[in-house]
Amino acid sequence: MSSVKQSAQAATSDVVDTAKNATAETVTAATDFLHTPAVRAALPFINGGLSGMVATTVIQPIDMIKVRIQLAGEGKAGGPKPTPLGVTRDIIASGKAMDLYTGLSAGLLRQAVYTTARIGCFDTFMSRLSARAKEKGQSVGFKERASAGLAAGGLAAMIGNPADLALIRMQSDGLKPVAERKNYKSVIDALGGIARNEGVAALWAGAAPTVVRAMALNFGQLAFFSEAKAQLKARTQWSSKVQTLSASAIAGFFASFFSLPFDFVKTRLQKQTRGPDGKLPYNGMVDCFAKVAKQEGVFRFYRGFGTYYVRIAPHAMVTLLVADYLGWLTK
């Protein structure tokens, strides 16, 4: 009986050891895979895209409200000022609560393209700048961070402009008379319809302010996030999580301040369609700036700053927090 018990214990021990070895081999294999050159190069882009898509899913209703506020009172200096609550009430009253998520498919595609490229390029640029600075016995400063943010934002915005355009068209479609609405079913439907009816080049309508907005946004978001985090780490005893959240909020404010005028113009240009006379309301970014300033006043560019910040800051916080977490998981 004793020998049978010993045999059973030995067999159990062998099974446990085998399971441990298999688990260790699996973890090692996964770790080795994550550290292959191709995967290491791709991870910043993958993590960036995933983090942006998570943030967009959370923030989409606020983005919808922001766009409607920017399009309200076009061409008029006076009139009632729309409020976030009023816009929300109007959207729900004209349809259903889920209408606040109109354009989500376009928003997710935009993040899959834009944020993947933006954060991926920024991380790649920063890695190279850090390596170069290390060789010289120096550290990466604010100027280098800002340059990396500007370059990454501009490049990513140009690539992601079609998805951005589709998002604005889907979100503004409900403002048109019922007979003139396109009733896009998805981002693919929107992109296909725009390309067929207006030409492929129309997918890059508003590209100039989109690029400038992205550069301004990244200058505020990525550069100030890195700088704020470095300053908070040096000057406070806060936990890493509190420092990250605080740096995200600071970065979101500067990102909003620098980018809102360009976001406003981008929305107007991407929403516009040709009238009965075949002409567009605006001829380009400069013309849009000039007409809005003359007809509606310069402060119109900052209308809805609070809503924009509430959209930008949490989006920045969620994006950067998820990106940091994914970076920690895959380091």
From Swiss-Prot:
Alphabetical list of Pfam families matching this protein: Mito_carr
SUPFAM superfamilies assigned to the protein according to its UniProt record, in alphabetical order: Mitochondrial carrier (SSF103506)
Keyword Mitochondrion: yes
InterPro entries per record: Mit_carrier, Mito_Metabolite_Transporter, Mitochondrial_sb/sol_carrier, Mt_carrier_dom_sf
Keyword field contains Secreted: no
PROSITE patterns: SOLCAR
Residue intervals passing through the bilayer: 42-62, 103-121, 148-168, 199-219, 245-265, 309-329
Protein origin, superkingdom: Eukaryota
Keywords carried by this UniProt record: Membrane, Mitochondrion, Mitochondrion inner membrane, Repeat, Transmembrane, Transmembrane helix, Transport
A GO CC term attached to the entry: mitochondrial inner membrane
Membrane topology reported for the UniProt record: Multi-pass membrane protein
Repeat region (Solcar), residues: 39-128, 140-231, 239-329
Localization: Mitochondrion inner membrane
GO molecular function: transmembrane transporter activity
Physiological role: Catalyzes the transport of 2-oxoglutarate across the inner mitochondrial membrane.
Protein name: Putative mitochondrial 2-oxoglutarate/malate carrier protein
Higher taxonomy: Eukaryota, Fungi, Dikarya, Ascomycota, Pezizomycotina
